[in-house]
């Protein structure tokens, strides 16, 4: 089993430190992990062209940034952790652009796989950012993995983040909970408990 962790920061700093603690915890449980750093490179916004739906190949028509690479890796992953630093009480524009396009083009790649998000800040805005990222999971039938507190850490440097003992413990516990859920899903499949097949009904309120 494998968990894909996405660092929505341009640096390997505080958010990376928190994600690394989640990964360490998962590795202890025999879960393979991979951390992808979005880095400083530009990421396109979704332009609503609809070509991904028309092509039906779970890929974005724009293939000049990291989004399709993430979708490809997501196909092989069993769970996900998305991390973001806080910019003006909000996730980074970079990770939102990635998730908008990845979830729209490759929604079925993520469906019914466990997901979790974490937010890192010097001080405020973590819970608002945390709520925004969770929206991607809850519209995609993804079990949301929680911890012993909201998945947030505080600090302005990696060293300060490590001093947030409760925050780092929350990251470690998140990894344990993710591993437990992945093992439950695997055991269920092995014993004939199949994933649900749900119908979708759409209603437009303005006609």
Mark where each language-model region is.
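A short beta-to-alpha transition loop/helix N-cap that caps and shapes the active-site region
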Residues: 42-45, 124-126, 157
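N-terminal beta1-alpha1-beta2 submodule of the flavodoxin-like/Rossmannoid cofactor-binding fold
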Residues: 1-105, 161-207
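Short, glycine-/small-residue-rich phosphate/pyrophosphate-handling segment
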Residues: 93-94, 104-152, 165-170
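Short alpha-helical linear motifs
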Residues: 119, 137-139, 156-157, 174, ...
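Internal, active-site/partner-interface "lid" segment
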Residues: 151-160
């Amino acid at each position: 089993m494998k968990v894909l962790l996405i660092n929505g920061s341009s640096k390997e700093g505080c958010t990376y430190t928190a994600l690394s603690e989640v990964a360490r915890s998962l590795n202890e449980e025999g879960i393979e992990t991979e951390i992808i750093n979005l880095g400083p490179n530009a990421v396109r916004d979704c332009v609503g062209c609809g070509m991904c739906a028309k092509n039906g190949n779970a890929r974005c028509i724009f293939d000049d940034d990291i989004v399709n690479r993430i979708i490809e890796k997501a196909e092989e992953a069993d769970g996900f952790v998305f991390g973001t630093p806080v910019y003006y009480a909000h996730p980074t524009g970079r990770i939102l652009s990635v998730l908008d396009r990845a979830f729209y083009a490759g929604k079925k790649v993520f469906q019914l796989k466990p997901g979790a998000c974490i937010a890192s800040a010097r001080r405020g805005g973590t819970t608002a950012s945390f709520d925004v990222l969770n929206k991607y999971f809850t519209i995609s039938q993804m079990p949301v993995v929680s911890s012993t507190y909201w998945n947030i850490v505080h600090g302005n440097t990696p060293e300060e983040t490590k001093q947030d003992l409760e925050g780092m413990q929350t990251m470690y516990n998140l990894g344990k909970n993710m591993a437990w859920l992945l093992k439950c899903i695997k055991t269920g499949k092995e014993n004939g408990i199949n994933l649900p097949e749900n119908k979708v009904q759409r209603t437009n309120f303005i006609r």
